[in-house]
A protein has these predicted regions:
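Active-site lining segments that contact anionic ligands and/or coordinate catalytic metals
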Residues: 29-31, 67, 150-152, 160-162
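A conserved acidic, glycine/proline-rich C-terminal tail/linker
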Residues: 130-131, 136-146
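Low-complexity, glycine/alanine/valine/leucine- and proline-rich hydrophobic stretches
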Residues: 152-163, 168-187
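C-terminal, non-catalytic macromolecule-binding modules
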Residues: 81-126
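Short, surface-exposed beta-strand-loop junctions and turns on beta-sheet-rich folds
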Residues: 40, 85-87, 169-173
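Flexible helical/loop "lid" subdomain adjacent to adenine-nucleotide binding pockets
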Residues: 1-54, 67-71, 75-77
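Conserved small/polar residues in nucleotide/adenosyl-binding loops
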Residues: 202-203
Length: 203
């Protein structure tokens, strides 16, 4: 309420408790490694931690780098619009890292399918329907994709930015030779021309 109800006014600085302003955030970049197994984060910088411990650690690290302030206009369960100001430094870092792992371990179609499920999944939780059959059904589909998402991501943090520097996975679908644009790569220009021609026949 109060000042937050005026959308033209920024939230007061003293409202933010966990995330530093960009001006007050650390000036030095920090790199961390996050390890995933079956879609779940299991370690930070090779230190095995519980999910709660990981979130707590990343909340502290991310907050010091000015990461995770969110100021949005959202639709409540009633449909009414309201302003929401949230602090989610750990969640912001984990989302970036998980997306980086998915880009390596899931196919294009799997990523599209999983992403199409997320709005419905999020709405069910937002509306308090965690125990609903719909949420359980969606969870099974999402968990099926997650079984492939294992590996490590190196993340750089600086002044509100979360940057993926490198990633590796035993389930990687990336083939350096096939992906090469060099002449010795897996696909030649003629291969691509033939592919484009074949696809054009179906549209």
């Amino acid at each position: 309420g109060g000042v937050l109800e005026d959308l033209s006014t920024p939230p007061p600085e003293d409202m933010w408790l966990k995330v530093k302003s960009i001006e007050d955030a650390k000036d030095e970049a920090e790199e961390i490694k996050i390890t995933f197994e079956n879609g779940d984060p299991i370690a930070v910088d090779d230190e095995s931690l519980s999910a709660a411990e990981i979130l707590k650690k990343l909340n502290l690290i991310g907050g010091n780098h000015g990461i995770g302030r969110i100021d949005i206009v959202e639709s409540r369960a009633t449909g009414m619009k309201s302003r929401g100001c949230y602090e989610t430094p750990g969640g912001t870092i984990l989302l970036k890292a998980r997306r980086a792992m998915e880009s390596l371990c899931l196919s294009r179609d799997e990523i599209v399918k999983k992403d199409s499920l997320m709005p419905s999944y999020a709405k069910l939780i937002y509306d308090g329907l965690w125990w609903s059959n719909d949420r359980v059904s969606l969870q099974k589909q999402i968990d099926n994709f997650a079984t492939k998402v294992s590996g490590s991501v190196v993340i750089k943090l600086l002044k509100g930015n979360v940057i993926s520097l490198g990633k590796e996975s035993k389930n990687s679908l990336y083939d350096e030779n096939k992906a090469s644009f060099e002449e010795s790569g897996g696909f030649s220009n003629q291969d691509m021309q033939d592919y484009i021609k074949a696809v054009s026949y179906t549209h």
